[in-house]
């Protein structure tokens, strides 16, 4: 890799986004997940681990590209073997990585993740600090952000400065350029100093988003324990006046949707699950890919329901394989699953 790439200028890895009219730009963390070679064990019991690329915003960028859409990733990794590997993975998956930066002094973040015997995921993170937390405003590719039809982000970048301020600036640039702002909080409590800090920061940017995707667990957490299935709870505590779409993912059961005009539920697509990692990110990819092509579906309930069924199918396919990025589906795979479901 040349001097340019190491200094943080990734022009030699840039690919042409296939259609800047439908570009989805994802901002945030990309890291290495270490996953046990056997399932159903604690991290301490795992006999060995295999490495896999991770980080929700990066997963979404790959998911959009895998579906034939146009996507880019903005974030920071370490100037190390893992960081360069992640940049290459994006490039190989046709994601524009010209907004990636490398840090000389901090390492690429690592996460050890296991699915325990009781079905709960267990996380152990190494970020003290990691490169993704150190992205500076001066390192933002403002031109790339301004091209975004949709600007997508999470909450993990809000945990530490300077990345927190950088994310807020990036959101402002995108909003001023007319981008649709998409927010998936992707709650990871072990990363936050306290539950209170997580709740406060996640909600601090809530009213800026046009589209929000949350899980049932996140509703319970953000509302302080309220019933996640109660429409009144969602509408009174989490729906804000500027919001165009709020989606609640319900795993294998599908999703609920809320807009200014209508609300409803779209059932899940039944498959045999192997690994749920990345299912939510695949769902978001499917939804954002549809939105990038046609924003009018936010006002058309029939089209929105079709887009959400498509997103449900994206999530379903992803759980049938191990890992997030390797399992992200192609357009053909989603169409085949939907056809077989209908027949």
Curated annotation (Swiss-Prot):
GO cellular component terms, A-Z: cytosol
Residues with N-acetylglycine modification: 2
Biological or metabolic pathway of the protein: Glycan biosynthesis; starch biosynthesis
Keyword annotations from UniProtKB, A to Z: Acetylation, ATP-binding, Carbohydrate metabolism, Kinase, Nucleotide-binding, Transferase
Entry's EC annotation: 2.7.1.4
Superkingdom: Eukaryota
A single GO BP: fatty acid biosynthetic process
Reaction(s) this enzyme catalyzes, per UniProt: D-fructose + ATP = D-fructose 6-phosphate + ADP + H(+)
Class of enzymatic activity (EC top level): transferase
Gene Ontology molecular-function annotations: ATP binding; fructokinase activity
DNA-binding among keywords: no
SUPFAM superfamilies named among the record's database cross-references: Ribokinase-like (SSF53613)
InterPro entries on file: Carboh/pur_kinase_PfkB_CS (IPR002173), PfkB_Carbo_kinase (IPR050306), PfkB_dom (IPR011611), Ribo/fructo_kinase (IPR002139), Ribokinase-like (IPR029056)
Membership in a protein family: Belongs to the carbohydrate kinase PfkB family.
Function summary: May play an important role in maintaining the flux of carbon towards starch formation.
Name of this protein: Probable fructokinase-7
Species per Swiss-Prot/TrEMBL record: Arabidopsis thaliana
Lineage per the UniProt record: Eukaryota, Viridiplantae, Streptophyta, Embryophyta, Tracheophyta
């Amino acid at each position: 890799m040349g001097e340019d790439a190491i200094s943080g200028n990734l022009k030699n890895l840039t690919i042409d986004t296939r259609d800047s009219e439908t570009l989805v730009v994802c901002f945030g963390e990309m890291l290495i997940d270490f996953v046990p070679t056997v399932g159903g064990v604690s991290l301490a019991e795992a006999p060995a681990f295999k490495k896999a690329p991770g980080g929700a915003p990066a997963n979404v960028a790959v998911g959009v590209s895998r579906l034939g859409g146009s996507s880019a990733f903005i974030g920071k990794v370490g100037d190390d073997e893992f960081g360069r590997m992640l940049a290459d993975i994006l490039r190989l998956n046709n994601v524009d990585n010209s907004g990636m930066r490398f840090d000389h002094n901090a390492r690429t973040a690592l996460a050890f993740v296991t699915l325990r015997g009781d079905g709960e995921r267990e996380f152990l993170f190494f970020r003290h600090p990691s490169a993704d937390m150190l992205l500076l405003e001066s390192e933002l590719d403002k031109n790339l952000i301004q091209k975004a039809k949709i600007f997508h982000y999470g909450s993990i970048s809000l945990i530490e400065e300077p990345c927190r301020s950088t994310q807020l600036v990036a959101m402002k640039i995108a909003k001023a350029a007319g981008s649709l702002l998409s927010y998936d909080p992707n709650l990871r409590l072990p990363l936050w100093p306290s539950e209170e800090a997580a709740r406060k920061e996640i909600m601090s940017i809530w009213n800026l988003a046009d589209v929000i995707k949350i899980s049932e667990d996140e509703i319970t957490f953000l509302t302080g324990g309220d019933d996640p299935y109660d429409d009144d709870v969602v509408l009174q505590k989490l729906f804000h006046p500027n919001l165009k779409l709020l989606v609640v993912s319900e795993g294998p059961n599908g999703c609920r949707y809320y807009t200014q005009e209508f609300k409803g539920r779209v059932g899940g697509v039944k498959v045999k699950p192997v690994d749920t990692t990345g299912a939510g990110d695949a769902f978001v990819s499917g939804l954002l890919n549809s939105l990038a092509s046609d924003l009018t579906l936010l006002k058309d309930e029939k089209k929105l329901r079709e887009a959400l069924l498509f997103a449900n199918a994206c999530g379903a396919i992803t759980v049938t394989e191990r890992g997030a990025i390797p399992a992200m589906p192609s357009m053909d795979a989603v169409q085949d699953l939907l056809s077989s479901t209908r027949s």
